Design a protein with these regions (language model features):
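A short SAM/SAH-binding and catalytic strip from SAM-dependent methyltransferases
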Residues: 16-30, 48-49
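S-adenosyl-L-methionine-dependent methyltransferase catalytic module, highlighting the catalytic core
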Residues: 32-36, 43-137
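Structural alpha-helical scaffold elements that stabilize or flank donor/cofactor-binding regions
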Residues: 9-11, 37
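Alpha-helix C-terminal capping/helix-to-coil transition sites in glycosyltransferase folds
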Residues: 13-14, 40
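Adenosine-cofactor binding site in Rossmann-like domains, unifying the SAM/SAH pocket
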Residues: 1-9
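Short, flexible segments with low predicted structural confidence
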Residues: 8-9, 16, 61-66
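Short gly/ser/thr-rich secondary-structure transition/capping motifs
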Residues: 1, 24, 28, 113-114
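Active-site micro-motifs of SAM-dependent methyltransferase domains
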Residues: 4, 25, 53
């Protein structure tokens, strides 16, 4: 159970990389889990659905409903996602915890890197966020 942490399973610096794909938003304490990732590994890599993608914004703003998209396919009442976030939210969390972002990539639902527009407006046009990070050096 990731919500219980990794201490019972791994010692400090057991790995070069710790990867969590499409799971962070479904944990009880994402910030504590990121800390655990960096305790057992030198670097972390996470991916998560971007709640600020334009399609989610449109559903919330114009229809007044919690978004249901290909990357957020469940209704609000049966979703495993308990901590939805945006690129900006994740970057603020990292800053508060002394975590350095080494690389950020945003992709569409088919995992393709976008056009220059996606690079210009990643929080609006990126459907999935991918971050590589470490403790501040």
């Amino acid at each position: 159970d990731l919500n219980d942490g990794l201490k019972a399973y791994f010692t400090d610096n057991s790995f070069d990389y710790v990867i969590m794909s499409q799971t962070l938003q479904a944990t009880e304490q994402p910030d504590a889990l990121i800390e655990e990732m960096l305790r057992v590994g030198h670097e972390g890599i996470v991916t998560f659905p971007n709640f600020a993608h334009w399609s989610a914004r449109v559903q919330l703003a114009l229809q007044g409903i919690m978004p249901v998209t290909k990357n957020l396919p469940n209704q609000w009442f049966n979703t495993p996602n308990v901590h939805l976030c945006t690129l900006i939210d994740f970057e603020e969390l990292c800053a508060r915890h002394g975590i350095e972002i080494l690389q950020r990539t945003v992709v569409d639902r088919s995992h393709r890197k976008g056009s220059w527009l996606m690079k210009l407006f990643p929080n609006l046009l990126g459907e999935i966020a991918i971050y590589r990070f470490c403790r501040n050096r």
